[in-house]
């Protein structure tokens, strides 16, 4: 939609990976719609994921005992946060939609050694293990950028969070197949896996959450299947601004 601004937070090491293709097609499709696209390529930026004393410029409010949350909150109010944090906060503040493009791996298995799955010798992707969570560099981005004062306050969270007029969407790839992420699958229902991130982090800051875009097991998929994953994402983006946010406190999560 013309005039909309989109931030893509990209957390993958290899530009030629399927995550790179998903990012590229998102940029192309949204640009065709007249959107302004900004990309934070965290690995290319060498983004610092650690939350440390260096995030506060100048004197601490309590030099005798360092409390990161308190000091960053005070630094935000005094405009004395490190520039890499404020640069990212500006990108978030200007965005109507934030897309998190990430690769998730759910265990330590080397899928290429399983004979029942086809392997691809050329252009094969290798990844760190993320253990049902986001890559450390993206976790660090959230820890440092979505700080108190900028993204939320007490009170001022969930539906009252400071980013309540923005949309967020997780676009991610997995190591396991779709069947593994079902209620009867070995890894469990994927909705439970994403709930802490979608609700506990993003919705806590006020984001309205769009349904995730999940590309299952591209590493063991055929070339045609991988192309279909990218095409499916491109097709969805054509009507992304018409989508309604998902319910972040659904009854199924609480066994109702």
Per-range role (PLM):
Residues 1, 73-75, 254-255:
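Aromatic-rich, lipid-facing transmembrane alpha helices and their immediate juxtamembrane interface loops
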Residues 2-35, 40-43, 224, 233:
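N-terminal beta1-alpha1 ligand-phosphate binding loop
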Residues 76-198:
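Helix-loop-strand module that forms the ligand-binding subsite of alpha/beta enzymes
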Residues 45-91:
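Phosphate/nucleotide-donor binding subsite
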Residues 16-17, 46-49, 106, 131-135, ...:
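Short catalytic/ligand-binding loop motif for oxyanion handling, primarily in non-cytosolic enzymes
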Residues 7-9, 38-40, 99, 124, ...:
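Hydrophobic/aromatic beta-strand patches that form the interior of the parallel beta-sheet core
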């Amino acid at each position: 939609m013309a005039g909309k601004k989109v931030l893509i937070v990209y957390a993958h090491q290899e530009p030629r990976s399927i995550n790179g293709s998903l990012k590229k097609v998102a940029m192309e499709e949204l640009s065709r719609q007249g959107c302004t696209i900004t990309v934070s390529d965290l690995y290319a930026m060498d983004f610092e994921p650690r939350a440390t004393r260096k995030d506060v410029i100048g004197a601490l409010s309590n030099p005798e005992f360092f409390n990161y949350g308190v000091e960053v909150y005070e630094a935000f109010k005094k405009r004395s946060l490190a520039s890499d944090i404020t640069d990212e906060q500006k990108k978030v503040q200007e965005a109507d939609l934030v897309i998190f493009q990430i690769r998730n791996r759910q265990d330590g298995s080397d899928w290429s050694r399983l004979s029942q799955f086809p392997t691809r010798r050329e252009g094969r992707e290798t990844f760190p293990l993320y253990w049902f969570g986001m890559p450390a560099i993206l976790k660090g981005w959230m820890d440092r950028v979505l700080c108190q004062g900028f993204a939320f306050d007490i009170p001022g969270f969930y539906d009252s969070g400071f980013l309540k007029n923005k949309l967020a969407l997780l676009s991610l790839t997995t190591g396991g197949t779709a069947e593994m992420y079902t209620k009867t699958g070995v890894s469990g229902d994927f909705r439970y896996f994403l709930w802490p991130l979608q609700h506990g982090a993003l919705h806590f800051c006020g984001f309205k959450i769009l349904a995730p875009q999940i590309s299952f097991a591209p590493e063991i998929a055929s070339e045609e299947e991988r192309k279909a994953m990218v095409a499916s994402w491109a097709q969805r983006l054509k009507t992304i601004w018409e989508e309604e946010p998902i319910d972040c406190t659904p009854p199924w999560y609480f066994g109702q």
